[in-house]
């Protein structure tokens, strides 16, 4: 089931990026991220482990000029274990260069995942406690994805980013349980067009 959902998400994500004929693929990105969570004010390793991510970023189509010319992306994220969360989706990235070779890049998107939505066991049972201890309970099959990245360029075609991503339904896509997912990691970028980031 997880493999089918993940494969379907990948196809939808790639198709949505390829459909606009006037946009072209500008960047290919590879990332490694770790799941983190807040444990009573302390940031600790999350329940969902680590993921590898691939992202395609296209040029900004003209119809997005009115919101600052963000660039559309499609991405997939595969967990390194059998028990973690896989996800994929689409979104928009804004990029601002604030110093020579340095840029800040926020993003907003939409993902579909194969993680746990709720606890299948009755409340206040040992099984429910054990399940909650091992899984983030996300409440909705689809989630919003927000990202913040700090980028350093290495020449005209390569760059690296330290970034944070948060995913949750925000009580908009669904109601009720909303533990969300948080990841931090590093990604490397290859630009097919050296002028793509300008």
PLM segments and residue spans:
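Short loop/turn motifs that connect adjacent beta-strands in outer-membrane beta-barrel proteins
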Residues: 20-25, 59-70, 97-104, 157, ...
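Extracellular loop and loop/strand-boundary signature of outer-membrane beta-barrel proteins
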Residues: 42, 75-79, 132-136, 171-176
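Residues on the lipid-exposed face of transmembrane beta-strands in outer-membrane beta-barrel proteins
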Residues: 52-58, 90-96, 108-110, 148-152, ...
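Outer-membrane beta-barrel translocator/channel fold
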Residues: 32-37, 105-147, 151
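Transmembrane beta-strands of outer-membrane beta-barrel proteins
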Residues: 26-30, 68-74, 88, 102-108, ...
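Residues that define the transmembrane beta-barrel architecture of outer-membrane proteins
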Residues: 46-52, 84-88, 142-146, 180-184
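Outer-membrane beta-barrel "beta-signal"
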Residues: 180-198
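Transmembrane beta-strand segments that form the barrel wall of outer-membrane beta-barrel proteins
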Residues: 26-42, 69-80, 167
């Amino acid at each position: 089931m997880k493999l089918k959902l993940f494969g379907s998400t990948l196809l939808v994500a790639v198709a949505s990026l390829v459909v606009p004929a006037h946009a072209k693929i500008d960047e290919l990105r590879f990332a490694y991220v770790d799941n983190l969570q807040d444990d009573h004010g302390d940031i600790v390793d999350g329940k969902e482990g680590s993921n590898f991510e691939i992202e395609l970023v296209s040029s900004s189509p003209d119809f997005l000029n009115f919101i600052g010319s963000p660039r559309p992306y499609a991405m997939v994220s595969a967990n390194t274990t059998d028990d973690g969360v896989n996800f994929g989706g689409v979104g928009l990235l804004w990029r601002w260069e604030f110093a020579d070779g340095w840029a800040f890049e926020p993003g907003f998107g939409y993902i579909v995942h194969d993680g746990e939505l709720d606890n299948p066991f009755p409340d206040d049972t040992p099984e429910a406690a054990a399940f909650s201890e091992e899984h983030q309970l996300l409440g909705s099959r689809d989630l919003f994805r927000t990202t913040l990245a700090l980028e350093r360029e290495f020449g005209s075609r390569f760059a690296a980013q330290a970034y944070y991503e948060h995913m949750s339904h925000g009580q908009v896509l669904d109601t009720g349980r909303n533990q969300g997912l948080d990841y931090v990691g590093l990604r490397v970028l290859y630009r097919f067009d050296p002028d793509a980031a300008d």
